[in-house]
Each structure stands twice: as structure tokens, then as C-alpha cells.
Amino acid sequence: MQRFIKWLAVITSLDLLVVLLGGALVTKTGSGQGCGKSWPLCNGEFVPSNLSMETIIELSHRLTSGSAGILVTLLCILSWKYYKHVRETKTLAILSFVFLVAQALMGAAAVVWGQMPAVLAIHFGISLISFASVILLTCLIFEIDQKFDARSLIMDKKMKFHIYGVTIYSYIVVYTGALVRHERATLACPDFPLCSKSRPMPTQLHEWVQMGHRVAAMLIFAWILYAMIIAIRHYKQQRVVYWGWIISFILVTLQAIVGILVVFTNASLAMALLHSLFISCLFAVLCYLVMIGTRSTVNAKETESTSKQTK
């Protein structure tokens, strides 16, 4: 059964990643109304008779979301049953399921009633939490923490501050990026790093949205770089922290490069999807560091309690 659960966890993680990228594809191609205002049917039909490209994209996104719902539900039930001895299992199972349902309902509401761009941006963020929760659940199932000796890890308050702070801030950056997409402000500023050569500062809403995201992205790049330097200097023996920040920096660097290329390639589809892919992976890595950080707090308390009993 454990072998089956491992395969299920991998397939579920990949399916949720496809859902995330599919949502970005729907937004990028303007396929949100590919099935009209009909849900769960498509243009009022179970199998639509008129298959335009927008309809195929929207319908494919709905199908992958539906399959993800089934897989996540099954994974949550089995992990709850067979891995309940691991402290985080129940919490992650609940988060995976609840946020998947929430993003499905928001997606349906957006189709039927329409939503403001600011609300639609939350849709991607909710999907991201469900994806990260399933990734962490998969890591627990594969016992990644044991391979990195994460169960005995103890971090200082400074490192935990950076982990929690960067993760929370990354979610804000994700929201600003999703807002850029839904406000259709991707090409509002045709130059980089300033808005344009003739007009370096933004003057209207779409330019402010775009430049706001750029500033937020630059700050998270600098913050992750700083945290990585601390990890390299002081956590070389703690492999999960050491490599966690190095991987995070690689991902945020790739994210920044692709973000710049989005501007200079006239928002090509490939660059837009890579932009969503890298931020999804980065957020999952940061969430894993958060989980390790909470374990560090527990480990520190247990060590302190043991030392007191010894005395």
C-alpha cells in the first residue's frame, strides 16, 4: 500500500502543477469564457459540439482540476490513515483538500458571475497553497526529512525569522504577479528596469501595477540572497537549510530572468508559463523550510526539557 501511496503522491503533485500552469494558460490566452458562463457543463453541453481553441483550453483546465480533486481527496484519506504518526500529516491533508475546494469554487464563480481582477488574483494564490501542501505531504511520504536529518534540526531565531518572513512575503509577490496578469498589465512597461526610456516612472494604473510587482520581486530576490549567504556561512552542517536556501536562490534567479524575458519577448506563452512554474516551485521549497522551522521550535523545546530533567 505504501508503494501505491508514493505513486499517488507523485501523480497528484504533477496534476496540481498542471492545474496551476493550466490556470496561467487560461488567463494568458483569454480562454476564461471558453465554455461561456456555464459550469460544470461547457456551453450548456456535457461534450461541447463547437470546439474552439479557447473552449479546448478551458475544458482541459476543468478536467485536470476535476482529476486533481479526486486524487487529492484519495491522497488525503490514505495519508491520514497510513501516515498519521507523522506530526504534520493531518494538517497538510486538511490544507490540501480545503484550499483545492476553495480554488475550484472560486474558479466556478469567476465563470458564472465574473470577478474583479483583484479577486481573480487570489485564485492563483489559493491554488498555490494547495499545491505546496501536497508537495509537503509527498515529502513526508517519501521521508525526505529523514534523509536530511531534519527531525533533529535546531535553528536560531534569526534564521526562522527569514524563513517565515520570506515565505509570507513571497505570497504577497505572487499576488502582485497574478494581479499583473488579470489586470492585463504584463506589457504596460515595455522597458526594464524602469517603465520606459521616455517615461521612467509610471503614470497610470496598469503601469503602477507592473512596477509595483517589479519592486516587490527585486526585494524578494535581495532577501533570499541575504538568507542564502547566512545559510552558507552558518548552516553548512544542516543540509536541509543549506540546500534549501541555495535551491530557493536558484529558483528566484530563474524567476527573475524569465520575468525580464516576458517583457522583451512581448509576453510569449513559453515565458509566461515558465514564470508560473518557477514561482510555484519556489513557494513549495519555502513552505518546506517553514515546516522544518516549526520542527526546529519543537526540537528546541524537547532538548531544553530533557536538559532540565537531566539536571
From Swiss-Prot:
The keyword Cell membrane applies. Residues 28-62, 113-121, 181-211, 265-271 are extracellular. Its main location: membrane. Heme o binds at H61, H123. The chain crosses the membrane at residues 7-27, 63-83, 92-112, 122-142, 160-180, 212-232, 244-264, 272-292. Pathway: Porphyrin-containing compound metabolism; heme A biosynthesis; heme A from heme O: step 1/1. It is found in: Cell membrane. Disulfide bonds join C35-C42, C189-C195. Residues 1-6, 84-91, 143-159, 233-243, 293-311 are cytoplasmic. The active site is at E58. One of its GO terms (biological process) is heme A biosynthetic process. GO terms for molecular function: metal ion binding; oxidoreductase activity, acting on NAD(P)H, heme protein as acceptor. Pfam families: COX15-CtaA. Its cofactor is heme b. One of its GO terms (cellular component) is plasma membrane. Heme b binds at H213, H275. It comes from the Bacteria. HAMAP family: HemeA_synth_type1 (MF_01664). Catalyzes the conversion of heme O to heme A by two successive hydroxylations of the methyl group at C8. The first hydroxylation forms heme I, the second hydroxylation results in an unstable dihydroxymethyl group, which spontaneously dehydrates, resulting in the formyl group of heme A. This is Heme A synthase. It comes from Bacillus mycoides (strain KBAB4) (Bacillus weihenstephanensis).
